[in-house]
Amino acid sequence: MDIGVCVASHINDIDYVVRAEELGYSHAWMADSQMLWSDCYATLALVADKTSRINIGTGVAVSGTRPAPVNAAGIATINALAPGRTFFGVGSGNTARRVMGLPPQRIAEFEQYLQTLVPLLAGNEAELRYDDKSIPIKHIMPDKGFVNLSDPIPLYVSGFGPKSLGLAGKYGDGAVLGITDPQAISGARHMLNEGARSVEKDLESPSNFYTTALTTMVVLDDGEAIDSDRVKAECGAMAMAAVHYSYDQFRNFGHQPPNALSGIWEDYTNLLESYPADRRHQRIHAGHNCWVVEEEEKFLTPEVLNASSMIGTRDQIIERLSDLTDAGLDQVMILPNFDTRFDVLERVAADIIQNV
């Protein structure tokens, strides 16, 4: 099992990835959300310059904010700086679009995007859809050092439901998941396989398809409660980001929240609905995956914390990682609270990476 880090892209926080490389983390995924963080490609360029071994890429770039040729050129530029260790993660825009009051791309649009993107990443000609036209495009100076399209850039497609997971299996070299339950991983593998079979791909070999799950980890001290102040300080932001996502699903589609949120749901929705409707999309993601805003701290119940993060003793987490490996997961990437990120980085490296 590989352990990677997902990073809220911060142009002045490159040392965090440098330290992750020193500690043996396998991948650094730079998050892409233009109304929250620094630009992911600018951050990746600095990361590429300061590191030499860790795999680096977008975690994940957003199809609905940058046209496929722009994203392809961006990651191919990073590949020129870090050949052989650059990857490209892409999704339809859960937070990056919703924070602007827009929905993620629809599945049909996302598939069309991937159809353009895949050949571009390989240095080939692609078809760009514009209005009702299909236009052939390609990078016309790929051999002059501007980009690197010679060294492969693995494509990892983010998927949550059956259709997006099917697209990941069909077009991707791997998938980015938001689940860390072994049974759910097995179910996701089935959906990935369905997509792969539609184009006669074989996902059975790990070398053919690489799966990653986003979460964070807290290694408990002896006798420590799952909702201790330290636990909240290390994974509370991840927990609330999951609540933000559930609220968006409820708000946009009428989906009911998971059972873990039942104890807070009424109070949480009342809080958000006290904000003006025309700017509520700005408030939903306050502190997103970095901090917990003060008025949301009361929602960090044991159930909410445990639903989105891997919290347990060293042995419990190692056993869970073993179960996830058996279910077909290749990597867990962690995204801890911003203020405690170095503490988590060191603890997970010492207690987990050294033992898996």
Where are these regions (language model features)?
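An alpha-helical appendage that flanks or caps ligand/catalytic pockets
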Residues: 103-145, 190-323
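N-terminal beta1-alpha1-beta2 module of alpha/beta enzyme domains
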Residues: 1-59, 153
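Short, acidic/polar
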Residues: 9-20, 74, 159-167, 313-323
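Hydrophobic faces of well-ordered beta-strands that scaffold small-molecule active sites
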Residues: 3-7, 28-30, 55-59, 86-90, ...
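Active-site mouth loops of central-metabolism enzymes
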Residues: 1-11, 61-69, 149-160, 217-220, ...
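Alpha-helix-loop-beta-strand connector modules within alpha/beta enzyme cores
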Residues: 41-58, 113, 120, 198, ...
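Glycine-rich, proline-tolerant flexible connector loops at the mouths of alpha/beta enzymes
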Residues: 27-50, 62-63, 94-97, 179-182, ...
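Conserved, mostly hydrophobic/aromatic
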Residues: 24, 47, 78, 117, ...
